[in-house]
Amino acid sequence: MISKIIKTCLIFFICLINVHCLASSITPDKLHAKVIKVVDGDTVYLKHKEFGKLKVRLADIDAPEKNQPYGSESTNILKGLIGQKIVELKKITVDRYKRIVGIIYYENTEINYYLVRKGYAWCYDRYNNRLKIKNAENLARQEKLGIWSSQGEAPIAPWNWRKKKGK
């Protein structure tokens, strides 16, 4: 009886280890996949031949929400850059919503950086640890690009917008 319990536990742990290895097999290496949907300015769906459909949140940045000023512009810029294209994904982690958080490259351009540098996303200070992204935001602000081009009120960061809207 005891050996049967031990055997069952051993099989369970072996299965658990295999599932963990499968889940982590796409990290930290890069993979190539097709963008099948741009959800908003910082979230896309990719289709990978081996791993299927992957929901990806762009690391280190936060783009305006869809119903926020510049939300549709940010989404459309991202669609224009990588919509239906084969991109390279460097997986950083998986967030609490089970999305892959990563850096996307297209034709040797880092898309995360590009969006911030052109003023279509904020550096997400809460999660960012790359000076390159913070510097990109500072340059976009100085040059009054995208979200920083308004002469009126300062733009509301997406994390404050979500808090204000109760999301």
Language model regions located:
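Small beta-barrel nucleic-acid-binding modules, primarily SNase/OB-fold domains
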Residues: I2-K167
